[in-house]
């Protein structure tokens, strides 16, 4: 005989409870780590792909990407760029075999201040997915939430029907501009905001509800829901499960396999912390941002300015490491090294 409903409910993992009111997304390039947690979607970034590309399990994908880059030919730089785009798409396509929803694939962070280059690179990634038999409805293109990135997202959505995930989002200004651009989804960061406050203020620990990253996402969620924006809010970059639980009820949350594992083992009761109903009574006031107002408001937030800049540099550095790794694999033999 099965246990009583009350007992069964008590034994339900925090992860299963979370899935009842939030879409759970796996934040990893290691697609073999996804199965156990049964997420709806998955997100990748240059750092995660770099880590996965160094694992023995994924060397076939790396070899396939290298072969593709060589086959297209052209200058060495062009071959490497094509190999990297292909590698991102190969990982994305494999991840899609394991999830019912969408995968996020990131445009090179070094293009973060070049709208046209971001649009072109995004369209190229979608074309590569198409060649792999994957339709654009299953892809989210990740772009840095600079002014240029947000405008690239607007153009991709409106003119090309390409869905965008705006990443490296730390300020309320970035969130408002993304909502006004009508992008599909935003990824406001939580843990990196906490990191900044721990490093730059006297306060070194926070209860989850007081966590500055949690408060930032809560404010954005309430603003979006109060004013009827359709853009999905997906909290990202978590340092602990307390932050995740404090954002239960958010549209989506993207979570690393390590923290998904902790939530799976956790049987404590979980209730939604965010809701559309509560958002209606929040004290948000609607604002409109043109480029000048956006730049001013974003610049007023020291944490956001530093973390956006830092995030772009980190993703760019990992893109360069990936390039070096592929360059070595592609050209070292023929250079007689």
From Swiss-Prot:
Upper lineage is: Eukaryota, Metazoa, Chordata, Craniata, Vertebrata
Assembly, in brief, is: Homodimer. Heterodimer with isoform 2. Interacts with KPNA1 and KPNA4.
Entry GO CC: cytoplasm; cytosol; nucleus
The UniProt entry, under CDD domains, shows: Transaldolase_TalAB (cd00957)
Protein name (database record) = Transaldolase
Q: Where is the active site?
A: 142 (schiff-base intermediate with substrate)
UniProt keywords, alphabetically: Acetylation, Cytoplasm, Nucleus, Pentose shunt, Phosphoprotein, Schiff base, Transferase
Checking SUPFAM superfamilies in the record gives:
Aldolase (SSF51569)
Sites where Phosphoserine occurs are at 237, 256
Q: Which InterPro entries match?
A: Aldolase_TIM, TAL/FSA, Transaldolase_1, Transaldolase_AS
Any one GO molecular-function label of the UniProt entry: transaldolase activity
What outcome is recorded for mutants in which this gene has been deleted?
Deficient mice develop normally; however, males are sterile because of functional and structural defects of mitochondria. Mice spontaneously develop hepatocellular carcinoma. The liver of these mice present an accumulation of five-carbon sugarphosphates and a depletion of NADPH and GSH.
């Amino acid at each position: 005989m099965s246990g009583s409903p009350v007992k069964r409910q008590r034994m339900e993992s925090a992860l299963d409870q979370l899935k009842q009111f939030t879409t759970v997304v796996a934040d990893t390039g290691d697609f073999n780590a996804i199965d156990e947690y049964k997420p709806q979607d998955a997100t990748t970034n240059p750092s995660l792909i770099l880590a996965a590309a160094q694992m023995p399990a994924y060397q076939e994908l790396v070899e396939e990407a290298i072969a593709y880059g060589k086959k297209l030919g052209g200058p060495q730089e062009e071959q490497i760029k094509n190999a990297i785009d292909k590698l991102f798409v190969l990982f994305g396509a494999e991840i899609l075999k394991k999830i019912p929803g969408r995968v996020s694939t990131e445009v090179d962070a070094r293009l973060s201040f070049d709208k046209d280059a971001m649009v072109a690179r995004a369209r190229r990634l979608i074309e590569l997915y198409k060649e792999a038999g994957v339709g654009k409805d299953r892809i989210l293109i990740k772009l840095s939430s600079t002014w240029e990135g947000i405008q690239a997202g607007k153009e991709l959505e409106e003119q090309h029907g390409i869905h965008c995930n705006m990443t490296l989002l730390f300020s309320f200004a970035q969130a408002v501009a993304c909502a006004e651009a009508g992008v599909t989804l935003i990824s406001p960061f939580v843990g990196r905001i906490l990191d900044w406050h721990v490093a730059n203020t006297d306060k070194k620990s926070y209860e989850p509800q007081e966590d500055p990253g949690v408060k930032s996402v809560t404010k954005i969620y309430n603003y979006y829901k109060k004013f009827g924006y359709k853009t999905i809010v997906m909290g990202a970059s978590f340092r602990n499960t307390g932050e995740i639980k404090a954002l239960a009820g958010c549209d989506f949350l993207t979570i690393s396999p390590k923290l998904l594992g902790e939530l799976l083992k956790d049987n404590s009761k979980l209730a939604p912390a965010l809701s559309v109903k509560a958002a209606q009574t929040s004290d948000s006031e609607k604002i409109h941002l043109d480029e000048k107002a956006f730049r001013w408001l974003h610049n007023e937030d020291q944490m956001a300015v530093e973390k956006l800049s830092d995030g772009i540099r980190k993703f760019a550095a990992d893109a360069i490491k990936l390039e070096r790794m592929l360059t070595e694999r592609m050209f070292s033999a023929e250079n007689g090294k």
